[in-house]
Regions:
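Glycine-enriched loop-and-adjacent helix/strand subsegments that border the catalytic/binding cleft
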Residues: 90-199
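N-terminal non-catalytic cap/leader segment that marks the start of a structured domain
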Residues: 1-115, 119
């Protein structure tokens, strides 16, 4: 069974994680799957990601058993609160600036600058991450130019360095969507983007 979407959510004040059902109307709780099929799962999705393929195989097995037995019912999305997938990150979020070719050409042509030869990296503080449909704080006393950009976020599943391009995807656990919120005025006022990217 292909596991497509893992989520962290809050249900009756209790934070837990699970997997979306096939029609994406509800979530199978990892706790409920563990109780039904005696498969131990870690408490957080972060810890589950650290298990790599071993964890995914165990989860797939539990979901297949549930498909046969119907022992665990999905919690309807309307009854739970979806949180960021990994709400307690241990490091900053690393980003690649100017990552869209047409946008780069347009931006540098407009400014009369040559195209960059190397990628531009910046980080965002993990404290600025919020969940799906959560209200974005506009910080009106700090910025007058809040902006947003839809980005593809890559979840790295294991440590490594000096990784050959041919092996890069072996280190990718999965993907999610990130709404990159930026205070453009703060970004312009500082050579380092961190402040404008981390409200």
């Amino acid at each position: 069974m292909m596991i497509k979407k893992l989520v962290t959510f809050e249900d009756l004040g209790f934070v837990q994680w699970g997997v979306l059902n096939e029609d994406e109307t509800g979530v199978y709780s990892a706790i409920a799957l563990e109780e039904a099929f005696f498969t131990p799962f870690p408490e957080t999705l972060f810890e589950f990601v650290e298990q790599g393929n071993e964890g995914l195989l165990a989860l797939a097995d539990s979901l297949e058993q549930n498909e046969r037995t119907g022992a665990v019912k999905a919690k309807p999305l309307g009854t739970i609160h979806i949180l960021p997938p990994l709400p307690e990150l241990h490091k900053n979020i690393f980003c690649v600036g100017e990552n869209y070719a047409e946008h780069i050409e347009e931006f540098h042509k407009e400014k009369g600058r040559p195209l960059p030869k190397f990628p531009q990296f910046f980080t965002k503080a993990p404290t600025c991450v919020i969940g799906t449909e959560a209200a974005i704080d506009s910080h009106p006393t700090v910025t007058k130019e809040l902006d947003y950009e839809g980005e593809l976020a890559v979840i790295i599943g294991k440590t490594g360095s000096d990784i050959p391009v041919s092996e890069a995807m072996d280190y990718v656990y999965g993907f999610t969507i990130l709404n990159d919120i930026t205070a453009r005025d703060l970004q312009r006022n500082h050579v380092q983007w961190f402040h404008g990217k981390s409200l």
